[in-house]
């Protein structure tokens, strides 16, 4: 929706909440919901940000949701535009519910990603995507791989939950909704949009409902804009800060020079804040079990590093280094008002914490490196050359299996490219499909950053920086972690750095770190 918002920004204050279960919004917590349930969530959102009444625009599934909000809560709606509204027959509805929404479950071999790529292609070749007759062929260009990849990433964010809002849209009494509409409404679609076939089925709509087909997608946006501008609108509210949610990590977008950084945090407990830093190709989501383990013990903050997770890449152009990440972390802490903290870094995130301790030693009181990358120069050079090859979207989807096996092999071999007997990780096999799937999504959320971040980590002078660190530092690793041997070697070489073996579950690490952090 960002392109549409930018198109209209000089006319309106545009606010686009992620539908529950999609993007960054929490799901409703049910496997089946009606569109009225989603509409109620929209009203709760309006209440939370202080909007009494608004004009609504929705596209495809959003078109159904916008109409549902107008139908169920007309007192909160000035006017509504539904672009891409579906009015299936009862037979079509039953077929769509049965065929359009297969379960999406990670497979050990990554086959679910190959299926999804084909699914993303088919939905712009046929409608419905599962039908292959000539009559179902769409008169559209096949989007380039980058555009398909963008849609695929949004699908991956929702996961199997993607079916909930789709099903609600298909089962919504859409014709009846238009007949009982009491606010001014426009229902439209371009001729190239497969939903345009439903416009003639909008029989006997309410007097204030306009049904109109347009020649092009751009024409639908111009028509929608004209409709929205005719309506009375309300003053935009002041931005409302995200409110804490007790007992869990809650999200915050932090304004910093160059963009925004996503923060996940919890402030239930008092004391000095613990800052948890993720690895390359990670985010605050990948360290969420570790961060959550501090809830009730300390305030905890986990920040998506620039270019990772949902953070903008705020690093200066060409400056992808551990030092640059440490400076960005310091800027984020300044914006959060955190003057002193303990830092717990997971794998490469520990290097960022270590550099922050050098950059701002008064800021970091205690430092933990979980799985420290204590490599000699020869191994660092080999890792820089071989560990992180860029992965680019491919027309036929081959990049998906490349990403899948890159992540999966990290749980089988060390380094992942040493697929020999010598490289076998013999302590445990970390190849759970759900875990691999989550980490593949992290790659795709950071397409231009993850591999550069790995290379930056492998160029960092970790041995020198550990030898000269002035902050009390703990080295730690679980017995399944290939970094354990490196951590032990570092502790032996640098006796001022104690080592601790960690529980197998990162959700236990917070409790295990507390004696050191509280010392």
Would you name each region that the model predicts?
Residues 1-26, 52, 264-312:
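Conserved HGGG/HGGXW glycine-rich cap/lid loop of the alpha/beta-hydrolase fold
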Residues 203-253, 495-519:
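Catalytic active-site module of serine/aspartate enzymes centered on a nucleophile-bearing elbow/loop
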Residues 256-266:
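A short loop-to-beta-strand scaffold at the N-terminal edge of the catalytic core in hydrolase folds
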Residues 6-8, 184-217, 292, 470-505:
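Conserved loop-alpha-helix segment in the C-terminal half of the alpha/beta-hydrolase fold
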Residues 71, 79-113, 358, 366-400:
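Flexible "cap/lid" loop of the alpha/beta hydrolase fold
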Residues 15-61, 302-348, 509-510:
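Active-site loop/oxyanion-hole signature of alpha/beta-hydrolase fold enzymes
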Residues 150-200, 429, 433-488:
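Conserved serine/cysteine hydrolase catalytic core
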Residues 63-74, 80, 350-361, 367:
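Short glycine-enriched nucleophile-adjacent loop
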